[in-house]
A protein has these predicted regions:
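ABC family nucleotide-binding domain
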Residues: 46-267
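Short beta-strand in the C-terminal region of the ABC ATPase nucleotide-binding domain
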Residues: 267, 272-273
């Protein structure tokens, strides 16, 4: 498994490069969403938009309405915080925006094309190619190295045979990203050998390896101490500035939200500001 993912178990030292010189995974993003991709659009400032989202969870005869008529826009190249207390519905909203779940009412568009009503397979393709996602918990595979964890999304996105043909390029991309997040000395370490902050930095590199247009972050500092959390936040903001990457971040922390370009407040399933 290890050799399949990265082609080598030897330690390597990535070439030093500036953050803006990171090798991009070469993709033709001009195809329509039917194939899992969405064409880039310069006509609108909004890369992602949701209208009148409602989500109800049902268990037997009981219903809990988690979101009620929520409108949301993510501005291209900006960092938007979704701020709210536990139970306000902010993580549910992020999961809907990331096509991990579907709304009971309302619609979501990405680059002007609707995505919430796509068949599951096409939603998965869209998410794999267009989005990067990080969570409070890191979800690194414990059996493989940090480098292999970062490379893994490319195997899933490209399919085994296409991945094997371009594995060297994907490895170089993963090494450069790990260098960018300060983990060039941890390429061959497994998750159990990393600190919490290092695991989250590895998760950020993994989320970026496919060159997503949009990064969704669900409480990315929630499992870290304040100092480490501030380091992770600073890293995300630097990546936003360097790459122009659009970021939507869920948080309950006012100080984190204050550093974002825009703040959306959510209370009891409704956007209030």
């Amino acid at each position: 498994m290890n050799d399949l993912v990265d082609g080598s178990t030897a330690r390597t030292s990535p070439r030093r490069r500036g953050a803006t010189e990171l090798t991009s995974v070469q993709e033709d993003r001009s195809q329509v969403v039917i194939a899992g991709r969405i064409p880039l659009s310069t006509a609108s400032d909004q890369i992602l938009e949701a209208r009148q989202l409602t989500k109800i969870y049902r268990k037997g005869r009981n219903e809990v309405q988690v979101l009620s008529g929520c409108d949301f826009q993510a501005r291209r190249g900006k960092v938007t915080a979704i701020l709210g207390q536990s139970g306000s519905g902010k993580s549910t909203l992020l999961h809907l925006l990331g096509t991990l779940d579907t709304p009971d009412e309302g619609e979501i568009t990405f680059e002007g094309q609707r995505i919430d009503n796509l068949p599951r397979r096409r939603r998965d393709e869209f998410r794999n190619r267009q989005l990067g996602m990080i969570f409070q918990f890191y979800h690194l595979l414990p059996e493989i190295t940090t480098l292999q964890n970062v490379m893994m999304p490319m195997m899933i996105q490209q399919g085994l045979f296409s991945y094997l043909r371009a594995r060297a390029a994907y490895r170089a991309r993963a090494e450069q990203l790990l260098e960018r997040v300060g983990l060039e000395h941890r390429l061959t370490h497994r998750p159990r050998e990393l600190s919490g902050g290092e695991m989250q930095r590895a998760a950020i590199a993994r989320a970026l390896v496919g060159s997503p247009q949009l990064l969704l972050a669900d409480e990315p500092t929630g499992n870290l101490d304040r100092e480490t959390g501030q380091t992770i936040l600073k890293l995300l903001l630097e990546i936003n500035r360097e790459q122009g990457l659009t970021i939507v971040m869920v948080t309950h922390d006012e100080s984190i939200a204050a550093d974002c370009d825009r703040v959306i407040r959510l209370e009891d399933g409704r956007i209030v500001a």
